[in-house]
Amino acid sequence: MKAIVCDRYGPPEVLRLEEVERPVPRDNQVLVKVHASSLNAADFEILGGGVSARIAGPFKPRNRIPGSDVAGRVVEVGRSIKRLKEGDAVFGDLFMCGHGAFAEYVAAPEDALMPKPESISFEDAATLPQAAKIALQGVRGKRPLEKGQKVLINGAGGGMGTFAVQIAKYYGAEVTGVDSARKLEMLRSIGADNVIDYQREDCTRSEERYDLILDTVAHRSIFDYRRVMAPDGMFVLVGGSRYAIFQAILLGPLVSIASKKKMGINPWKVNLEEDMRFLLELNEKGKLSPVVDRRISLSEVPQALGDLSNGLVKGKVVITVGHDDDT
């Protein structure tokens, strides 16, 4: 089978498209014929040798084939499999169970996958497992979002951000999206009430006060946002630089203790089926749709991942694997 492989940390150029052996599922795994996958910021962080990646693989990536989001069809099942069967259309997030989605086939644990409804395509399903789920968990957080509350989303034009805008609007919030000028019209089209070009305006110097600030990119100190938080507002970090993440983990709780303002990092909960079912319901109701920047083949992954890391992608990049016997 064809797969994107990575044998060392580095820029996207270290990725190669190679012919490798098709995986054999273990007793608790199924073999999925991949129809679609999608890129996430986490893919680039792992490729670059981030802290979490180095813990798992100090000198090279622990998993040779990257890719977390997957949608496809089960073609083989292990002996312990009880729920899924051959022919089932499935999708899921493989972040915590070996990755491997950037390939024609992947072996995955049964509990990392759930049935794909006929109402959603393989391509659209492949955009949801990581970005939409993290966006949902960030927007809902520890405190329910109320109608009319003001939400600021930094990095609103990316994969996670575009889902967060739509989810916040579903809950009735007034949403302000922050991103580059080339993404602002798209943000308006998916429901953002206000947009800010971060290259022309500093959102932390605004006179607005936000009930929830969701930061998906974290290119600045989390404390810059304190000024624009409502008295009992909440700041949630869901992605970004290592410095900002460590700052949120170590110092955010101190701010939360000293005032009513709450600052911290969203503890990403992987493979929560209830979250995915809720996202599917929103999709079926027409309240949540993936913004797809482009659809690519496996061979185009290195270029697209470079564009993603440079902030050039609007929404999601979908990888179509090219199996022509199914849709």
Regions found by a protein language model. Give the residues of each.
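C-terminal capping/lid region of NAD(P)-dependent oxidoreductase domains
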Residues: 287-294, 305-327
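Mid-domain Rossmann-like dinucleotide-binding core that forms the NAD(H)/NADP(H) cofactor-binding site
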Residues: 125-197
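Short glycine-centered segments of the SAM/dcSAM-binding site in methyltransferase folds
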Residues: 89, 150, 233-234
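N-terminal Rossmann-like NAD(P) cofactor-binding module of classical short-chain dehydrogenase/reductase
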Residues: 91, 213-214
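A short acidic, Gly/Pro-enriched loop at the edge of an enzyme's catalytic core
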Residues: 204-212
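NAD(P)H dinucleotide-binding glycine-rich loop of Rossmann-like/cofactor-binding domains
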Residues: 60, 68, 76, 83, ...
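Glycine-rich beta-strand-centered segment in the early N-terminal region that forms part
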Residues: 21-38, 51-97
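Glycine-rich phosphate-binding loop and adjacent beta-alpha segment
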Residues: 220-287, 321-327
